[in-house]
Amino acid sequence: MKTLQIIKQDQDKIISLVEHETTHTKYIQKELNYYDKTLYQTLQKIKSPYLPKIFVIQENDNHLILIEEYIKGKTLDQQSFSKDEVKDIMHQLCECLDSLHKLNPPIIHRDIKPENIIYHDNKVTLLDFGIARFLDSKKSKDTLILGSVGYAAPEQFGFQQSNPQTDIYALGKLMNYLLNGSLEHQNNIPLDLKQIILKATQLDYKNRYNSVKEMDLAIQQKLVIIPPLNNDTFKSKMISLAWIVFTLMIVADMEPGETIKNSFINKLSCFLFIYFGLFLYYNKNLFHKHMSKVPWPILYSIILFIFVCLDVWFFMWIDFLI
């Protein structure tokens, strides 16, 4: 391996960008002075899209040498994000941590912060397991005070043992930072997301979410917008409500000579058609996230056309039954 760059060096580790001399493939090489070999062997076996692959684990003169996958992209502290992007990042991190927490015993990362997370092409990668550890049910508290100030949970300062809720605390702090650019202030955060952050960052770990899956569910429930019920802002709620009222006013009157039955069916069909367009508009980022390469103007037209066809067929069938 040829060393291209020393990324980080301190008394605990040396992290380098290296290149294979034959294939010219780039890797990350880590030389660790303090380590848990079993933990890295466990990480090597985990098949997760959110963790860098570990190709080599080798002990050499009281050092542990790791050769890991090189991940391109910037860390979270080098970027800014919309609310929808933050929700997506948190969703991916919850899935990543769930794969660690469901192990027996669970692995606790203990150092979740923007500098340890790469976000590239809408994909999250969690890095730096330098202070990660297995949960030890026999211990009542951590023996060493480790973690990053601002993201470390109270139990990391020697009050109790680190546990899965320790990572949940850091996720809450991270979410606050990504939404507002600060660890403390919550000025511009919507109420529903603020409540998630407050629950995740409770001082007593027993009052936090029971698992990252539970926290993810709380976030996921806000990913799909049902206008005007759960729009992110008061302004968008009012716009949605006004649009719905306006639509109802347009379709309210019966045409001369039209029966009540046919009028109801036609007007309801018209309203559902327009509301479906409103639903697509407010959830466009969610659809774009999962299908980023789709030509959306064409797809929207196709979806609306299919909806109209189904809509007409459905109400003709109801009309026949009535």
Q: What are these model-predicted stretches?
A:
Residues K141-E155:
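Conserved activation segment of eukaryotic-like protein kinases, specifically the C-terminal portion
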Residues D167:
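Conserved catalytic-loop aspartate of Hanks-type protein kinases
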